[in-house]
Amino acid sequence: MVSPMTKKKRTEDAFRAGIVEDRRPWGMFRRYPHEEVGSIKIITVDPGGILSLQYHDRRDEYWIVLDQGLEVTVGDRIFSPAANEEIFIPRGTPHRLRNPGPAPARVMEIWIGRSGESDIVRLKDDYGRN
């Protein structure tokens, strides 16, 4: 018989093994294991880093700002959110993050919809990506 603690440890190990870390020109993100209908990741934007101005066809995004200091673009609006501010980005809406500050800054991104990293339509990218 397998103890409840052993089952919990196996589940935790499987979860941790599914975490994917990906470096990008602007910083990095950690994507956590997910079901087909969504995902959660922590995006870290390095000082001076800027994500592409982009939108998604198959997902909405919900951001929770973890660190102050980011500049956020959603549609035509550009603003500097406070830590713990929550931002909803409907699919099809151009958006980006920029870090003009001296320290790395993070956002928790929750996406809703059947989508993946391939569902990125870049409108403008400072690193020459399509």
Provide a role label for each language-model segment.
Residues 1-4:
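Short, Lys/Arg-enriched N-terminal segments with co-localized hydrophobic residues
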Residues 6-24, 96-130:
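Double-stranded beta-helix
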Residues 16-55, 59-60, 110:
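A short glycine-rich, His/Asp/Glu-containing loop-to-beta-strand
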Residues 47-49, 58-59, 77, 93-94, ...:
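A generic "binding-loop/recognition-motif" signal
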Residues 52-54, 72-73, 89, 95-101, ...:
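Short beta-strand His + acidic residue motifs that chelate non-heme Fe in jelly-roll/DSBH
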Residues 76-94:
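Short acidic-glycine-tyrosine-enriched beta hairpin
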